[in-house]
Amino acid sequence: NHHLNNNIEYSDDKENCLNESLEYNHQIKLNKQNQNSFRNRTAFTDYQLICLEREFSHIQYLSRIDRIHLAQNLNLTEKQVKIWFQNRRVRWRKRNLF
């Protein structure tokens, strides 16, 4: 009887260990997915920033066509240009409120 109980306990411990291991592996996968979902911050060159600022000084809202052309000229994605303009408008508004 005692031997049987030991096997059951051992079996439970083994199962718990397996479950914990599976949970741990699942958490590692989730952490890797979360890390991969965040993009690296774009480091704009001085030239790109000068061109973006110059364009912003003329117009704060680019049409899609203008955004595509600017992105191509600066070797950026359309999304990078769009986000830069969004962020720049926020800074512009903050500075002009005070």
From Swiss-Prot:
Residues folding into a coiled coil are: none
Q: What domain of life does the native source organism fall in?
A: Eukaryota
Provide GO CC annotations from the record.
nucleus
Is the keyword Aminoacyl-tRNA synthetase in the record?
no
Q: Which UniProt keywords apply?
A: DNA-binding, Homeobox, Nucleus
Indicate where this protein is primarily found: nucleus
Subcellular location field:
Nucleus
Q: Pfam families in the record, alphabetically?
A: Homeodomain
Q: Which residues bind DNA?
A: 37-96
Q: Which GO terms describe its molecular function?
A: DNA binding; DNA-binding transcription factor activity, RNA polymerase II-specific
InterPro entries per record: HD, HD_metazoa, Homeobox_CS, Homeobox_TF, Homeodomain-like_sf
What CDD domains does this protein map onto?
homeodomain
Q: What is this protein called?
A: Homeobox protein SMOX-4
- This chain's source organism reads Schistosoma mansoni
Q: What gene is it encoded by?
A: SMOX-4
